[in-house]
Structures are given as structure tokens and as C-alpha cells.
Amino acid sequence: MELTKKEISALQETAKQYMEFASLPIQKEKIKLWKALNRSKMERPMVVIDQIPWNEMNNEHELDLFVENPVFRRVELNLKKEIYKYKHYPVDMVLDPFIRIPKAISNTGYGMKVEEETLYASGNVSSHVFKNQLATIEDAKKIKDMVITHDELETDRRFETASEIFKGIAPVMMEGNMFHLGVWDHLSQFM
């Protein structure tokens, strides 16, 4: 899926705003403090805010997205989340002076699909009931090992596209995916 001029412009404007914060001198100071902490030479306790209820945070439309392409929509969302956090509660976060682009990595998951029914949905809140697919010991055989694959040609294409979009605004860095391995979080949806 090609990006429109409007989408490219939205990405560029978001990247410019991100880089304004990422280029501030305070970033180097925060990096110094984090490195000291990681070397067991803490200068002061460090604070980071995590586990944000993003579905509740877009009251002022700061997180509205304009890009349809799934890869670059993710880039747009990640940039906007970082900007949002930095504007509202920066504490000791560090903004890297580059734009992260996801490599083309896929994951087969555990070989099962969640079967659910939505009981209640209102705005950003919903309640679900999950079909028990693991009722017996035999059912456990349905769980498969994950298979992780990397499409190098697609990763190269993403890098080229991103480099062109963000040229003169920010360097581009390819990043791997972080796969959530909290097995119980997944298993609870199969039971």
C-alpha cells in the first residue's frame, strides 16, 4: 500500500515535533543518569511511567492517526505516544534522536485463535467471555511453538521508504519486534 502525500506530510510533521523534544539537551543528561543507574552508580532514583491506558488518553485528539498503511500507522502511533508522554509526564524518559521503523517480522502465535463473545462494549471499555478450548489434557496438544520469520526484502523496502520520508528530519533505525511472552495472558483467552 502506497502512502499518500497527505500521509507522508502527517508523518513528517509528527517526526519534526518528536525530534524537537528528542534534540533537547536534557536528553543527554537523562541518558547519563540512566547509564549511572545501570552501572550500579545511581545518582538518584529514576522514574518511568509505564502501563498507560491509551484508550483513555486521546481526549484532546493528540493521538489521532492519519496514516492508513499498517506499518507506517504503527510508526505514527509510536511517535505520537512518545510525544504525548513527553508533553504530559516526561519524568526520566529519554527520546532517542532517530525514528524507529519495525522490521518485517512475523509470528505464528500459539497455533490457536481466540474465540470470544463481547458481552458489553461502551466507548473504549468492553467485557468478553472466552470459549474454553483447553478443557482437557488432550486439548493442550493444540498449543504449538511459535515460529518467528523475518522478510529481509520487505525490511529493506521499509527502510528505503522511511529514509525517503524522514530525509532531512531524522535518521531512521530499523528495530526488531518485541513479542509478548506472558504465556498466561494468552492462555487465559483460550480457557
Residue ranges and their predicted role:
Residues 1-191:
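Catalytic cores of TIM-barrel enzymes
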